[in-house]
Amino acid sequence: MTEKTIALLENRINDLECQVAFQEQTIEELNDALTQQQLLIAKMQDQMKYVVGKMKNMDSSNMVDPAKEPPPPHY
């Protein structure tokens, strides 16, 4: 191989190493974002279960049948 070919190959290897380094950083950032989203989703699911449980336990006698309500006043 000539010196020119070797220099081109070395440059190509350096470029590929830079690309891999940037990809590793991007993958790590995406993994961190995904982890945060998973934690947020889990928290939201717990909150939703709590709200649904509260709604199921509500006394249905407190709710007024819309058919029995008087009509709203007309202006």
From Swiss-Prot:
Give the InterPro entries listed for this entry.
Answer: SlyX (IPR007236)
Q: Which Pfam families does the annotation name?
A: SlyX
Q: Which Gene3D superfamilies match?
A: 1.20.5.300
Taxonomic superkingdom: Bacteria
In the record, the note on similarity to other proteins reads: Belongs to the SlyX family.
Q: What is this protein called?
A: Protein SlyX homolog
